Amino acid sequence: MASNKILGIDLGTTNSAFAVMEGDEPEIIANAEGDRTTPSVVAFADDGERLVGKPAKNQAVQNPDRTIQSIKRHMGEDGYTVEIGDEEYTPEQVSAMILQKIKRDAEEYLGDDVEKAVITVPAYFNDKQRQATKDAGEIAGFEVERIVNEPTAASMAYGLDDESDQTVLVYDLGGGTFDVSVLDLGGGVYEVVATNGDNDLGGDDWDEALIDHLAKEFKNNHGIDLREDRQALQRLKDAAEEAKIELSSKKETTVNLPFITATDSGPVHLEQSITRATFENLTSDLIERTVNPTEQALSDADYSKSDIDEVILVGGSTRMPQVQEQVEALVGQEPKKNVNPDEAVALGAAVQGGVLSGDVDDIVLLDVTPLSLGIEVKGGLFERLIEKNTTIPTEESKVFTTAADNQTSVNVRVFQGEREIAEENELLGAFQLSGIPPAPAGTPQIEVSFNIDENGIVNVEAEDQGSGNAESITIEGGVGLSDEEIDQMQEEAEKHKEEDEARRERIEARNEAETSIQRAETLLEENEEELDDDELVADIEAAIEDVEEVLEDEDADTDEIESATEALTEELQEIGKQMYEGQAAQAGPGGAGGAAGAGPGGMGGMGGAAGPGGAGGAGPGGADADDEEYVDADFEDVDDEDDA
C-alpha cells in the first residue's frame, strides 16, 4: 500500500537527508544505519555488489577506483559519465542510486510504499541541472512533485511556527555549492526576493585546500607525492575532512596517518599539526568568493544589511568559524543557530510536501528563477525574455521578425545566464521553426514564449503568426533523457533493487543458520546428561553437519540454506518437547516457557531456534531484528525595433 505522504529530500553533494510530515511537524527520518544524514557516496565492490551511503564511504580507502563521491557537482553536465569496470554511469543514474536507498529506508520507516517526493536543489542551479535532478528522482521510482530551492526550503523549516513579518537572508554553504537568498516571510507566505550563488564552491574546496597543503608538506619532507597514490589520496581526503570538522571547535588538530606510503627503507608515516589560523589562511580565497554573491543578492533585492531581520545558516560547512564571522561582517548581525544546518533543507522540503499533499495549510511559496532566460539574436547577442529573480511560475513572450529577405526558417537557441553575448551563457537547447512564408525582411511576426513551471523547468515555443506554424521545446536534462531512457533506467534500478534484496535475504538466512548451529551445540553441551535419546542426538548432530555443509557451499542459494536450517530447527523442537515433558511437573505453572525456543521468539535461557523469530530469544523479527543492511536565428526584435 502506498503512503499518501510526500517525502522531502535534500539531495546533497556530500550528505543527503530526508524527512516527512508527522502531524504538524516535519521529522527527519533516520536511515537503515540509524543516522540522520546519509553520505552521498556510491561504490561497487569487486563482486559487483553496489554499496550506497555509509557502507560505501567506509570502504573508500580500500576501493577508491570504484567509489563515486560528490556526483552532484556534475549534474546536468553534458557527456559526463563515471566509468566503473565495463559500465558507464551518468550523474543522474548515480544520484538515483542514492535516492533509491533513501526511498527504501523511508518505506521501512513508514511501513508503506513511498511514491512521491519533493527534492531540493541549489538556488543557483540552472535548468539543465534541475531537469537532471528530476530525472534522477524518476529513475529511482519517485513521482517528483516539486523541485524546490534549498535556501527556500530552509526558510520554511525556520519559519513554520512564526507568523511575524520579517526579511530573512539564507546563507547556504554545502559540500559542493553556495547559495544566498533573500526572502520576505509573513502570514504563511514565503516570497523569494533575490538569489545568487556559486555552483562551484563548497566544503569540498576547503578539504581540497587542506589536502594540497598536507601533500605539499609531505613531498617537501619525503620527496613523495601522495596525490599519485589513489589509496593514499583517499586517506588524505578523509583525514582533511575530519581535520576541517575538528578545527570548527578546536584551535589546533593533528593529522596522523601511519603507513601512508613506503620506500625502500620501510614505511613512511604522516603526522602534521594544523592550526585553525593556518587553515583559515589556506582558505581565505574561498571565503572571499562568498562575498560578492551575498552583496549581489542584497542589491538585487534592493535591501541594505540593516533591512535583514534574521540570518539563517544552512549546510554543514557553515559550522566553520571563519564562515560565521564572514556572514556577521557582511550582514551586521550574528546568524541564527536554532536550525540544524544539516537538516533544515530536508525539513523544509517535507513542509512543502505537506503543502502539496494537503497536510499543511496556509503556506504559500513564491520562489524565483535564479538566472535570466532568453534567446540568441542577430550578432550573437543574448535577448532576455525572463529576467533573473522573477517569481515563478511565470510566462513571458516577445515578437521577433526575420533579418533577411525570404527567410523561411529560424533557429531558436535558448540560453540562461547574465552575460550579454549569448555564447557566454549556458545553452539550454535549440529548435528550428520552419514553414515561414517567404517575405521581405522584417515582415514575418514570430512570437517566442517562455514558460517556467513551479519546478523551474523551462518550456519555449515559437509561433509564426502568419502561417500558424509553431515549434516548442522542453529543456531536457544533462543527457537529454527521453521517456524511454528514463523507463529503461527505472527498470535497471528496479533490477538492482531486487538483487540487493536477494543478497540481503541470503545474508539473513546465513545469519539464522549460523545462530541455529550455535544454539544447537550449546544445547547439546549444556544438557548432555538429560538427553538420553542417542538417536535424536545423532539426528541433531547430522542436521548441524548438513547446515555447515550448506554454509560452506558458496553456490548454495537462500532456499537451500533455509531448508537445512529448518530441518535443524525441527530436530531442536523435538528435544524441546522431550525436555518440556520431563520438566513440566517440576517447573510448576509457567515454568515450561524455558524450553529450547519452544515459545514464541525462542527463549533466552537455554536458547533455540524453534519459535517465531527463532534464534534463541531474538523475539519477533528474529535474529535479523538488529542486523545492519550490507549491504541554438537570426531575427529582429520587433518590440524594441533593434536589429536582432
UniProtKB/Swiss-Prot annotation:
Spell out the PROSITE patterns in the cross-references.
HSP70_1, HSP70_2, HSP70_3
Biased segments, Basic and acidic residues type: 492-513
Keywords of the record, alphabetical order, are:
ATP-binding, Chaperone, Nucleotide-binding
> Transmembrane region positions?
none
Outline the segment boundaries, as ranges, of region: Disordered.
490-533, 570-644
> Locations of Gly residues compositional bias?
588-622
CDD domains in the record: ASKHA_NBD_HSP70_DnaK-like
Pfam families linked to this entry: HSP70
Recorded superkingdom = Archaea
User: Where is there biased composition of kind Acidic residues?
Assistant: 523-533, 624-644
Q: Which GO terms describe its molecular function?
A: ATP binding; ATP-dependent protein folding chaperone; unfolded protein binding
Q: Gene3D superfamilies recorded for this chain?
A: 1.20.1270.10, 3.30.420.40, Actin, Chain A, domain 4, Substrate Binding Domain Of DNAk, Chain A, domain 1
Instruction: Give a short account of what the protein does.
Output: Acts as a chaperone.
Record-stated family: Belongs to the heat shock protein 70 family.
Name recorded for this polypeptide: Chaperone protein DnaK
